[in-house]
A protein has these predicted regions:
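Signature aromatic-anchored transmembrane alpha helix within multi-pass, membrane-resident enzymes
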Residues: 131-140, 247-262
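Aromatic- and kink-enriched transmembrane "portal" helix at the membrane-lumen/periplasm boundary
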Residues: 27, 41, 45-53, 62-89, ...
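Extracytoplasmic catalytic/substrate-binding loops of multi-pass membrane glycan-assembly enzymes
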Residues: 1-12, 19-32, 117, 153-154
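Membrane-lumen/periplasm interface segments of specific transmembrane helices
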Residues: 125-202, 210-214
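Membrane-water interface signatures at transmembrane helix termini and the short loops
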Residues: 83, 183-247
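Membrane-interface alpha helices of multi-pass inner-membrane proteins
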Residues: 92-95, 104-128, 218
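Membrane-proximal lumenal/periplasmic loop motifs of glycosylation machinery
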Residues: 12-31, 43-47, 179-186
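Specific aromatic-rich, kink-prone transmembrane helix
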Residues: 86-109, 237-241
Length: 268
């Protein structure tokens, strides 16, 4: 029996009824997987594995496959009726295709990514450090203009969805400076942030790429009710920073710190 939080119940219902924004933007997986919980479970868990493998390719280090054990990934493993892991895996695959120069494939993949989750094209562009992949926001804009439904899943949820800034402030009040929520779930990957502060990271987009990835990860918390599973979309970029600046012998330690992190938290 898998967990079905409110978001999951929305996705399961989307093939037969309209749902509210932003969930109605994420229509591809609900259309294809429909109400089949087993199919959702397979899709999400295969995506978690793929994220580890793709990050290893992206960074050039097999040790960075350990990102699959970050708390955001393990939370989705146990709550698989979600679009996040498939979206992240797709964003990373799109970036890798773009980095190979196969734009004839990368651009259609970016467009498909925009139907999985509205943030997928943004993260594809960050991972590849190339703005062309933002073309994937076109289907997001088209879908945004289409009719959406109301939210009736909980008594208070409709108001939270209608007023996202209020929701973000409500759920993060007094928690912005909590290191157990905002920092320690990264484990050894936090070295990527230290590198950015030192200004010595010179791979791909360099410190600017790390900064943009962190901004794209943390700023949505202003309008979100979750934390870790949102900002850890930046994991591949921080992993790349670690591989770039740390000595080779330190990478297994980073991987072990991720897998056995005692301050990982629940991952939400």
């Amino acid at each position: 029996m898998v967990n079905l939080p409110p978001d999951s119940r929305r996705y399961l219902a989307m093939h037969k009824r309209r749902v509210c924004r932003p969930f109605h933007l994420r229509w591809l997986l609900p259309l294809t997987l429909r109400g089949n919980v087993k199919a959702w479970t397979w899709a999400t868990r295969l995506a978690v594995v793929a994220i580890g493998l793709l990050t290893a390719v992206y960074t050039g280090s097999p040790w960075m496959a350990a990102v699959a054990f970050l708390p955001a990934m393990t939370w989705n493993w146990h709550n698989p009726v979600m679009v996040d892991m498939v979206g992240m895996a797709w964003a990373l695959a799109t970036a890798l295709v773009a980095l190979e120069g196969w734009w004839w494939l990368a651009i259609p993949m970016a467009l498909v990514g925009g139907t999985i989750r509205e943030t997928v094209p943004v993260w594809s562009a960050i991972y590849a450090w190339h703005p062309v992949l933002l073309v994937g926001l076109v289907p997001v804009a088209v879908r945004w203009a289409m009719r959406h439904g109301s939210d009736t899943w909980t008594d208070h949820n409709a108001e939270l969805v209608a007023r996202p800034f209020m929701a973000g402030q409500l759920f993060h009040r007094g928690r912005w400076r909590d290191p157990l929520l905002m920092v320690t779930p990264w484990a050894g990957l936090i070295a990527g942030v230290v590198v950015m502060a030192g200004g010595v990271f010179d791979a791909r987009g360099g410190a600017a790429q790390v900064g943009v990835a962190l901004a794209a990860g943390y700023l949505p918390l202003l309008i979100a009710t979750d934390s870790v599973r949102i900002y850890q979309w930046a994991a591949p970029v921080l992993a790349l920073a670690c591989v770039t600046v740390l000595p080779t012998w330190a990478l297994p330690l980073v991987a072990l710190s991720i897998v056995f992190n005692p301050w990982r938290g629940p991952g939400t």
